[in-house]
From Swiss-Prot:
Catalytic activity: phosphate(in) = phosphate(out)
Intramembrane segments: 366-383
Keyword Membrane: yes
Protein name: Solute carrier family 53 member 1
């Protein structure tokens, strides 16, 4: 592997700007070599003056980069020292409180089950659990800083060695000895001391003096390129996907040759449509995960997942393929139910019952930690007013807005099994066309409209909760207004449908109101997608016209195509309304809804790429590379200690003014400036695609 590829794979993406501009230095050296005057046409003194002038500029740039690295390292080291003092203080407070309440001298002597503890003891137990997680994340941040230290030294050594090789001199090596090897970022070994002290604290105080158990908890995921998935996982993904494709072909043939023309297939389609959308969503989420990892978008940090244990794209493909096979087999069984002793209505119950059991399975199998994380997240989403709302909370609620058809089909299935299904007929899911009209697929009884509004309601109350926590009307109240338009759209659609069915004279009034609010909702959401969720149409976009100053994905064409796609699919309802209003084709609304529901899932899949890119750039602007986990707020003692650290000689230093050279594809991340950076200019660096490693 070339060093540039090694560097791209191992850097911390959120700190990308703060590394040495290795590729830029390489371009600088090669350009100087190519533009150097030839000794055949000019005298030797001219050539020497050219290279002397170039070296002066080269080493000045090296000094600026070295000052930048020293400053950033000092800032992060001071932050780590403050964080370690805070964690030690929190740990000591928890241990002291435990001694006072139980008389037990050390944590490892407690062995009572949690449900036997008093309220105060449960709080202390939870604090210790949070401390273990906090020390684990803190240890990861130390390793990242140590990796930053080592990589930058290696980069300096490599680029100065290349300088000497191209210019046939030894001044690069001399400069490295005189400047880099005595630089604070390289000579300071306090990071190693912090790592050792953290290991000792976790071993002695939190893990019963067991070093193996402590290091297992502190284990750092690989900081290099993504590790290949286990061979059996890859095999299962290929096997499941192959079987799924074959079964889909079989389904099409069975539908053509086995279904009777006098039977209505719509109850069957509505019941199985939601399962297909869920499988499509999982598969596309796997592609999202792969794309984020390849582009260096740290989705593990954004969702605050455990970097040591989370699902990769391979696992998501595996789950989607497995559920897809079950979905196909269940639907095929319905087609061939007439020659079976099992009625058709049993198969959907078995399929969805298995899916629910797979999710809530209490045993520690089948991705237990990931399933438990999802269940906790769903609970937080549905109880949004009572919790602070994080990124993962409102991200999942946004996904539910694109999966509202699943909720509506679930409501239809419950209603159909309760009121319309002929339990005494084996082909109950394929009723005769001549039977009495449907009830469950209409708005007339009111429940369907309420179910359709549930996802928008969840996001609406999340926005209100965020306004309560931040007291910021913009963007939270404005965002709540966006989701409130869904309530009006669904309400007028339901009123139009019921009044049209009953032949009321005011039907067209509700139709026009429905159209008006559809236009308002689509324009509102489209503008919010482009400007707020994706951060596009930035006035400081520079060469990235209509986009933003910083872009992560390699081609600007991706962004322009995405804008067009979002406009088309946000206004796809115009096609649906036009066809259903102007045609007498039976079930035209069902046909259009069945076509457009997967397209909405696809639109959300594309939206995910750029929404997380925007959040990732926010993390880059704050240099946030690990989760922020704390048991207690910073107290006065810790604040005093922090101030002392900042006053030390190895604390934060003032940055020197510097203006880096510019390249065609660069980022300049805006962020709140530290006091030490009040007069510093933003640093631009060349972007390379990186794989942000997260073990599974």
């Amino acid at each position: 592997m070339k060093f540039a590829e090694h560097l791209s794979a191992h850097i911390t993406p959120e700190w990308r700007k703060q590394y040495i501009q290795y590729e830029a230095f390489k371009d600088m050296l090669y350009s100087a070599q190519d533009q150097a005057p030839s000794v055949e046409v000019t005298d030797e003194d001219t050539v020497k003056r050219y290279f002397a002038k170039f070296e002066e500029k080269f080493f000045q740039t090296c000094e600026k980069e070295l000052a930048k690295i020293n400053t950033f390292y000092s800032e992060k080291l001071a932050e780590a020292q403050r964080r370690f003092a805070t964690l030690q203080n929190e740990l000591q407070s928890s241990l002291d409180a435990q001694k006072e309440s139980t008389g037990v001298t050390t944590l490892r002597q407690r062995r009572m089950p949690v449900f036997h503890l008093s309220h105060e003891e449960r709080v202390q137990h939870r604090n210790i659990k949070d401390l273990k997680l906090a020390f684990s994340e803190f240890y990861l941040s130390l390793i990242l800083l140590q990796n930053y230290q080592n990589l930058n030294f290696t980069e300096f050594r490599k680029i100065l060695k290349k300088h000497d090789k191209i210019l046939e001199t030894s001044r690069g090596a001399d400069w490295r000895v005189a400047h880099v090897e005595v630089a604070p970022f390289y000579t300071c070994k306090k990071i190693n001391q912090l790592i050792s002290e953290t290991e000792a604290v976790v071993t002695n105080e939190l893990e019963d003096g067991d070093p193996q158990k402590a290091m297992k908890r502190l284990r750092v995921p690989s900081l290099g390129a993504a590790q290949p998935a286990p061979a059996w996982t890859t095999f299962r993904v290929g096997l499941f996907c192959g079987i799924f494709i074959v079964l889909n072909i079989t389904l099409v043939l069975a539908a053509v040759f086995k279904l009777e023309t006098d039977r209505s297939i719509w109850p069957l389609i509505r019941i199985y449509r939601g399962g297909f959308l869920l499988i499509e969503f999982l598969f596309l989420l796997g592609i999202n995960t792969y794309g984020w990892r390849q582009a260096g978008v740290n989705h593990v940090l954004i969702f605050e997942l455990n970097p040591r244990n989370n699902l990769s794209h391979q696992h998501l493909f595996e789950i989607a393929g497995f559920l897809g096979i079950l979905w196909c087999l269940s639907l095929l069984a319905c087609f061939f139910a007439p020659i079976s002793v099992i009625p058709t209505y049993v198969y959907p119950l078995v399929l969805y019952g298995f899916m629910v059991f797979f999710l809530i399975n209490p045993t520690k199998t089948f991705y237990y930690k990931s399933r438990f994380w999802l269940l906790k997240l769903l609970f937080r989403v549905f109880t949004a007013p009572f919790h602070k709302v994080g990124f993962a909370d409102f991200w999942l609620a946004d996904q539910l807005n694109s999966l509202s058809v699943i909720l509506m089909d679930l409501e239809y299935m419950i209603c159909f099994y309760s009121f319309e299904l002929k339990w005494d007929e084996s082909g109950g899911l394929l009723p005769n066309n001549s039977e009495e009209p449907e009830i469950c697929h209409k708005y007339s009884y009111g429940v369907r409209a309420i179910v359709q509004c549930v996802p928008a309601w969840l996001r609406f109350i999340q926005c209100l909760r965020r306004y309560r926590d931040t007291k910021r009307a913009f963007p939270h109240l404005v965002n709540a207004g966006k989701y409130s338009t869904t309530f009006f759209t669904v309400t007028f659609a339901a009123l139009y449908s019921t009044h049209k069915e009953r032949g009321h004279s005011d039907t067209m009034v509700f139709f026009y109101l429905w159209i008006v609010f559809c236009i308002i909702s689509s324009c509102y959401t489209l503008i919010w997608d482009l400007k707020m969720d994706w951060g596009l149409f930035d006035k400081n976009a520079g060469e990235n016209t209509f986009l933003r100053e910083e872009i992560v994905y390699p081609q600007r064409a991706y962004y322009y195509c995405t804008i067009i796609e979002d406009v088309i699919l946000r206004f796809a309802w115009t096609v649906q309304i036009s066809i259903t209003s102007m045609t007498l084709l039976p079930h035209s609304g069902d046909i259009i809804a069945t076509v457009f529901a997967p397209l909405e899932v696809f639109r959300r899949f594309v939206w995910n790429f750029f929404r997380l890119e925007n959040e990732h750039l926010n993390n880059c602007g704050e240099f946030r590379a690990v989760r922020d986990i704390s048991v207690a707020p910073l107290n006065a003692d810790d604040q005093t200690l922090l101030e002392q650290m900042m006053d030390q000689d190895d604390g934060v230093r003032d940055r020197q003014k510097n203006r880096p050279w510019k390249y065609s594809q660069s980022i300049s991340l805006r962020r709140p400036r530290l006091a030490s950076q009040s007069k510093a200019r933003d640093t631009k660096v060349l972007i390379e695609d990186t794989d942000d490693e997260a073990n599974t």
